[in-house]
Amino acid sequence: MFAGYRKLDNLVVIVDLNGLQIDGAISEICDPEPLDKKFEAFRFHTITIDGNDFEQIAKAFEEARATKGMPTAIIAKTVKGKGVSFMENAVNWHGVAPNDEQFEIAMQELEKAGEALCQK
């Protein structure tokens, strides 16, 4: 409330909205939606993006920098564990470290995903 009231246009809040928390889907436990409307009620400019898309992230920060007279909330809709087949959207990976074998597999999958991004 303070940030919006004071028009803190140099403040950017980023919310990682992956739809999961430690014990399940947030929609079944404590659904925060509509999150954008809640921030707007506190005088925030809101931007909702695909948080797994680097171009959208960069554009959101450009828009936030250009926004005057109010703070910005970037709501980044993401996929938990994106790019690692056995971790994607898996609640059981919250706060758990992979073993050595899982780590190697994850790194290989992420390297392939990174190479694909560089080809764009």
Whereabouts are the PLM-identified features?
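Glycine-rich ThDP/TPP pyrophosphate-binding loop and its adjacent helix/strand module
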Residues: 1-120
